[in-house]
Amino acid sequence: MGAPHFGPGGVQVGALLLLGFAGLVSGLSLEPVYWNSANKRFQAEGGYVLYPQIGDRLDLLCPRARPPGPHSSPSYEFYKLYLVEGAQGRRCEAPPAPNLLLTCDRPDLDLRFTIKFQEYSPNLWGHEFRSHHDYYIIATSDGTREGLESLQGGVCLTRGMKVLLRVGQSPRGGAVPRKPVSEMPMERDRGAAHSAEPGRDTIPGDPSSNATSRGAEGPLPPPSMPAVAGAAGGMALLLLGVAGAGGAMCWRRRRAKPSESRHPGPGSFGRGGSLGLGGGGGMGPREAEPGELGIALRGGGTADPPFCPHYEKVSGDYGHPVYIVQDGPPQSPPNIYYKV
């Protein structure tokens, strides 16, 4: 039975397949949303509407005020951005335990938070979205530091600062153009990359657990569930193969082990090189059992009593069994064997 073998070629093929699968499940990066009153998309007719698909990513950005950038407002605006269901978003209300995305409270830093639209999140606190459902990103504060904790109204009502996310749906009319991930300047400064494009989304940032203060780079997007599952499956198969190979090697080594050492039988103490069993019973010579040791005990002379015409197995409760046997013709000195 051969053990499974995983050569370097198999590992390389598995890695290539995993990379290809991860490439298939990666989505697109939507145009970022710059969250402050300088973003004119909030005042657009019909509101700020996006049509993300499962697998897409969306960046929410809080432009800094010091030094001012291309998307900065005249004065810094303080916001907390919440993800809410459709009915709550239409009323501009956040629940008592809101789903906080980003807090814009760092005037000297550009803050960013990346949303990954996925049905199942590998992160315990990750966000999950259902296709063909509507969600809202809203800000319910009034733009001041003192109003950060407000959970209803605010700029969502007064300035229309909310974004409607129509997940898995097609746009009616004009859709916000989407670019592939490779074309998005993810590693460059967002302000410089999009300064010449007036139709970009504007969203304030918040240094939450998933938000980072960014100079040139932001947080890495969370891994997609299919890619994580594929990697875990490949690792499980590899571990299973290694365990099988180890088990097969142990099994073969055990089979190749020599059988338990046995004590050689007693030497040839009589005719035919075997222990002779006393006459009378018509029994022929008997081969020594494993572990027996026969030692001849000779009598003192002809005055010794005749030996027994049979053999008897003495109790072996306290050691190896002992046999008393007869060997040789009656006229010769008696040979008695016992086992030590």
UniProtKB/Swiss-Prot annotation:
UniProt subunit comment: Interacts with GRIP1 and GRIP2.
Cleavable signal peptide: 1-27
Membrane-crossing segments per the record: 228-248
InterPro entries on file: Cupredoxin (IPR008972), Ephrin (IPR031328), Ephrin_CS (IPR019765), Ephrin_RBD (IPR001799)
Subcellular location: Membrane
GO CC annotation: glutamatergic synapse; hippocampal mossy fiber to CA3 synapse; presynaptic membrane
Family: Belongs to the ephrin family.
Pfam families linked: Ephrin
Sites carrying sugar chains: 210
Region feature Disordered, mapped onto this chain: 168-227, 254-300
Alphabetical GO biological process terms: adult walking behavior; axon choice point recognition; axon guidance; ephrin receptor signaling pathway; negative regulation of axonogenesis; T cell costimulation; trans-synaptic signaling by trans-synaptic complex, modulating synaptic transmission
Motif PDZ-binding per record, residues: 338-340
Compositional bias ranges of the Gly residues kind: 267-284
Modification sites for Phosphoserine: 274
Skewed-composition ranges (Basic and acidic residues): 185-200
Entry-annotated residues carrying Omega-N-methylarginine: 271
Membrane topology category: Single-pass type I membrane protein
Disulfide bonds: 62-104, 92-156
Residues on Cytoplasmic side: 249-340
Extracellular face residues: 28-227
GO molecular function: ephrin receptor binding
Record function comment: Cell surface transmembrane ligand for Eph receptors, a family of receptor tyrosine kinases which are crucial for migration, repulsion and adhesion during neuronal, vascular and epithelial development. Binds promiscuously Eph receptors residing on adjacent cells, leading to contact-dependent bidirectional signaling into neighboring cells. The signaling pathway downstream of the receptor is referred to as forward signaling while the signaling pathway downstream of the ephrin ligand is referred to as reverse signaling. May play a pivotal role in forebrain function.
Protein name according to UniProt: Ephrin-B3
Alphabetically ordered keywords of this record: Developmental protein, Differentiation, Disulfide bond, Glycoprotein, Membrane, Methylation, Neurogenesis, Phosphoprotein, Signal, Transmembrane, Transmembrane helix
